[in-house]
């Protein structure tokens, strides 16, 4: 069993999803959400809180911030014992720039064994992908995650409705 979080945002009327790319040591390379396997008796939500912090090295915040994101979840996918929570966040075009520069610096200056064995360096970069880029992204995703992207594309109309409704509510 496993779980992950996929941040979503609206920009210029289109949905954008924040994906992370596995580092060069990953057994299954490619793009995916921010998640992983459950530890012990963790619930999917507990897994997301832990994994979201680890894989984004705190860029989305700590446990309270991840819990808040989860409480605003707009869509949930369950595929092959994996639960993915699609959660809205404000679009920040600079987030990938800062995260990616930070990761490049750390991953070139730290001992490679630390990078290889530490849970906080699983992602080498992050990037916003628009809803129209998902089909092109799918073959670049981790093998297990390609089915999840396929289902995500099928669910886009539903996600679009909910995210736009929630973003209009927040602006009032």
Q: Can you say where each PLM-predicted feature lies in the sequence?
A:
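Functional cleft and adjacent loop/helix regions within the main domain
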Residues: 26, 30-35, 40, 77, ...
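Hydrophobic pocket-lining residues within nucleotide cofactor-binding pockets
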Residues: 38, 89, 134
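The catalytic Nudix box helix
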Residues: 33-71
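N-terminal strand-loop-strand
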Residues: 1-34
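Nudix hydrolase/Nudix homology domain
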Residues: 25-30, 94-172
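Short, well-ordered beta-strand micro-motif
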Residues: 7-9, 21, 86-88, 127-130
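Short beta-strand micro-motifs in enzyme catalytic cores
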Residues: 1, 16, 81-85, 125-127
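Acidic, glycine-rich loop-and-strand cores that form catalytic or ligand-binding grooves
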Residues: 61, 65-111
């Amino acid at each position: 069993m496993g779980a992950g979080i996929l941040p979503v945002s609206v920009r210029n009327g289109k949905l954008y999803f924040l994906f992370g790319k596995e580092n060069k040591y990953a057994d299954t390379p490619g793009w995916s959400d921010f998640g992983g396997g459950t530890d012990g008796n963790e619930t999917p939500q507990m897994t997301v809180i832990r994994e979201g912090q680890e894989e984004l090295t705190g860029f989305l915040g700590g446990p309270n911030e991840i819990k808040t994101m989860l409480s605003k979840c707009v869509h949930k996918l369950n595929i092959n014992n994996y639960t993915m929570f699609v959660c809205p966040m404000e679009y920040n075009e600079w987030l990938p720039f800062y995260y990616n520069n930070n990761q490049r610096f750390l991953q070139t200056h730290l001992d490679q064994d630390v990078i290889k064995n530490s849970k906080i360096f699983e992602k080498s970069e992050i990037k916003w992908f628009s809803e129209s880029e998902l089909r092109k992204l799918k073959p670049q995703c981790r093998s297990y995650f390609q089915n999840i992207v396929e289902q995500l594309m099928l669910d886009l109309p539903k996600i679009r409705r909910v995210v736009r409704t929630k973003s209009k509510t927040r602006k009032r």
